[in-house]
Amino acid sequence: MLNKIFYSLIKTIVYLIKYFKLDRFFFDKIIFNIGLKQLIENKKYYSEFTSLQQADLKIFSQNGEDGIIDYILHRLDIVSPNFVEIGVGNYRESNTRFLYNKVHPKGLIIDCEDNLKEKVKPHLNFWKGELKIQQDVITSNNINEILNDHCDFNIDLFSIDIDSVDYWVISKLKSNISKIFIAEFNPIFGPDLEVTVPNIDGFKRNEYHYSNLCYGMSLRALINLMNKKNYYFLGTNIQKMNAFF
């Protein structure tokens, strides 16, 4: 119940920011502090949780990934996780933004959005941590080269959400690339069928199919792929869009 109330509060604050064109940085501080307090409250019950979805809590993530990530890190006793996140947009809603604001670890974020650095920087206190911002279109052909060039640390948390050829990009990653792995899957494909879009250069979901719903991979395809890379499936968020390993 508290998580639902908190989620509604966050949505209301975001709406007010957009509608009245208010100072986002000021309200982001409010969201961060409220979210941190709720996370601390939730942590009291971590020992009683039997599924990831009980930890579901949205602060700066798109859905409830912030809470789930904190829960997994707590279980693994990781305090300051170095991370890579691919597919962050302008970083306002992402899986690692709250994490970076909270403990300021080393991080690398990658997206193809134009003027990425200019869009990301206003939202963060860069002097407190080491965050690299790389503007690139990620494919199965360049993923390892980009990581080799820009990631000079051991990865604790890896997250990918590019609404594209995610399956094929993941397939090129080395096994056990990180302690925690998060990937978006396409719930439209259903939970049982092993489905992915073809590995097309320059794939764009709005051009591949008129519905704009054909992208990524099914949950089953993702689980089977991650099993080959020695990962264990932990579960999904409540919205059943992100899988955790």
Spell out what each predicted region is.
Residues 6, 62-66, 92, 140, ...:
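A structural signal for well-ordered alpha-helical scaffolds and beta->alpha junctions
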Residues 41-48, 94, 196-200:
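Short amphipathic alpha-helical segments, especially helix-boundary/capping motifs
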Residues 82-85, 98, 104-106, 150-160, ...:
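Conserved acidic-Pro-Pro-aromatic motif
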